[in-house]
């Protein structure tokens, strides 16, 4: 197997970090590589806050649900949906910019942020570092907006740790749903989705058991726990305060 493909297939979230320093030249290379990511209309509507100060990383951990593993990261990168840049560009030539005021525009920002997250983590992984995506930054968006002095049209959507991985005790990466219930030929297939869920429910349960964590929830239980409530209920109001809103008029 191609070495790059092998490395990508072995990717996993790494929460056990040694606390050792990420080399400055490696971090610069990660950022330079991630900046080459594909983005909609070359608008470059993401920005990053790179955090290395230990006290600030501690604050990030506390505001992200008190996740202890974040504190052991040498670097935390906050990924921002950033329409301030594009709005400045259009304002400077007397033009209109509706990117933060349409459903499609907001989706563009979210998609680009996801691509950026993947780019950062892939580059870090190639260099031997461990990462974990942190969606819980959306549990306290207004605190992060204040902490990072974010102007209107900029929003903290997801973050990632970067650090030197400790010895990984897990036998394998987490399994995934069956390929044929994930990648469909020509049309979506609800029956294959249902079949895949049933197969994966057993496989995921077995994986937890094999790795000595039988108390962890199954796939169905995880979905029930996470999505049985509106998890981060200040996202809408905090986005609106930052100038994001739907003003689409359908005709």
Would you name each region that the model predicts?
Residues 1-251:
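Acidic, surface-exposed loops and disordered segments
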């Amino acid at each position: 197997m191609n070495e790059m493909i092998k490395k990508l297939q072995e990717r996993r979230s790494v929460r056990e970090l040694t606390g050792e320093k990420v080399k400055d030249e490696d971090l610069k290379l990660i950022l330079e590589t991630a900046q080459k990511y594909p983005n909609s209309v070359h608008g470059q509507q993401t920005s990053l806050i790179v955090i290395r100060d230990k006290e600030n990383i501690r604050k990030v951990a506390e505001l992200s649900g008190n996740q202890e593993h974040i504190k052991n990261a040498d670097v935390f990168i906050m990924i921002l949906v950033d329409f301030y840049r594009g709005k400045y560009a259009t304002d400077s030539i007397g033009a209109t910019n509706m990117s933060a005021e349409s459903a499609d525009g907001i989706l563009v920002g979210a998609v680009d942020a996801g691509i950026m997250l993947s780019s950062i983590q892939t580059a870090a992984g190639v260099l031997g570092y461990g990462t974990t995506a942190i969606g819980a930054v959306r549990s306290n968006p207004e605190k992060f907006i204040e902490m990072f002095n974010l102007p209107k049209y900029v929003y903290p959507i997801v973050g990632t740790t970067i650090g030197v991985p400790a010895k990984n005790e897990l036998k394998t990466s987490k399994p995934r749903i069956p390929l044929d219930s994930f990648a469909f030929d020509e049309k979506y297939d609800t029956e294959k989705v249902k079949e895949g869920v049933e197969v994966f429910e057993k496989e995921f349960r077995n994986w937890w058991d094999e790795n000595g964590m039988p108390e962890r929830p199954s796939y169905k239980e995880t979905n029930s726990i996470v999505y049985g409530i509106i998890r981060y209920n200040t996202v809408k109001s905090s986005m609106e305060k930052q100038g994001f809103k739907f003003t689409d008029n359908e005709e």
